[in-house]
C-alpha cells in the first residue's frame, strides 16, 4: 500500500497491517528487539529521479503486500541538505534476507549496491553525527535550538542502545 501524504517528507510503502498498529521490523513473524534491529536491520539505497521512483514504487508494492519486502520509503524531493540532487529510496529488510531483497531489486534494473545498517544510520543522526549536523545547518537553527535538537536526538537514539531487550519502536516521520 503506497502512502503518499503531501505533508510528509517521504512516500511510504507499507503492508496494510502496519497501518493497524503492527510493526514492520519483524523477522520470521516476530517483532524485533532494539538489539536485533541494531544487529540485523538495514536498507538498500536506490537513487533516482522522483518520477522513476514513483514507477518503481508501483512495481515493488506487490512485494511489500506479500511481505517479501518489509517496508519502503523514498524522498518526495531530493535531500539537498544532504548534498544530493536525486531522491533516495530506502528498501528496508533484515540483513539475513537482504540477498533475496536485492534479487527483487535487480529485476527492475537496479545495479548499484548500497547497503546501510540501521546502526550506522542511527550513529549518523546522533549528536555530532554528519546527517544530524547537515540537517540542522540546512534549517538555519540558532545554537540554542541546535542544542535542543541534539538533546532530543541523543535521548531517542540512546534509548535504543541502552534498552536492548525492548521491542523496537519506530519514530513518526
Description of each model-found segment:
Residues 1-173:
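Structured alpha/beta or helical-core interaction and ligand-binding surfaces enriched in interleaved
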Amino acid at each position: 500500500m503506497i502512502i503518499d501524504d503531501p505533508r510528509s517528507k517521504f512516500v511510504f510503502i507499507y503492508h496494510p497491517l502496519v497501518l493497524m498498529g503492527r510493526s514492520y521490523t519483524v523477522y520470521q513473524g516476530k517483532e524485533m528487539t532494539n538489539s536485533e534491529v541494531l544487529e540485523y536491520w538495514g536498507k538498500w539505497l536506490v537513487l533516482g529521479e522522483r518520477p522513476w521512483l514513483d514507477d518503481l514504487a508501483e512495481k515493488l508494492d506487490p512485494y511489500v503486500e506479500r511481505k517479501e519486502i518489509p517496508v519502503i520509503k523514498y524522498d518526495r524531493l531530493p535531500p539537498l541538505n544532504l548534498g544530493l540532487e536525486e531522491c533516495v529510496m530506502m528498501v528496508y529488510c533484515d540483513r539475513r534476507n537482504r540477498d533475496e531483497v536485492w534479487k527483487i531489486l535487480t529485476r527492475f534494473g537496479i545495479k548499484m549496491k548500497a547497503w546501510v545498517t540501521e546502526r550506522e544510520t542511527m550513529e549518523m543522526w546522533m549528536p555530532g553525527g554528519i546527517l544530524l549536523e547537515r540537517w540542522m545547518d540546512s534549517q538555519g537553527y540558532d545554537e540554542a535550538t541546535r542544542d535542543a535538537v541534539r538533546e532530543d536526538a541523543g535521548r531517542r537514539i540512546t534509548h535504543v542502545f541502552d534498552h536492548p531487550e525492548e521491542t523496537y519502536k519506530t519514530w513518526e516521520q
